[in-house]
């Protein structure tokens, strides 16, 4: 049975995010909790009252706009997934390569770590292969 999604509360949170004047300082390779909200169908949702989900910054265009990939603690295999390690965390996380997304940096809530330079290179390589397929 599908869990009911809380679009109403997410809409209120999204209004507050939009009105926020401050943006965090961030870099590529960083892993953050971001307010991804409530989404449609199989798109990855955030959780909790701030609708948070861990993400990795794969491309910084400027201080306002970035490409991200969502992460999950569930170990998944296949061409749409890749395991990475995050600094200060012994557990592996799974990058969901098929869910690349453009975000406004206002959605970034707090940094939780980094992945290695080689880790980001491998993510970009696998993502490019997925796009070219």
Range-by-range predicted roles:
Residues 28-29:
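Loop/turn positions that initiate beta-strands
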Residues 15-22:
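Short alpha-helix capping/helix-loop boundary micro-motifs
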Residues 44-88:
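Compact nucleic-acid interaction/catalytic patches
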Residues 1-11, 49, 84-133:
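C-terminal terminal-subdomain/extension
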Residues 37-42:
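Short, charged beta-turn/beta-strand-edge "cap" motif at the junction between a beta-strand
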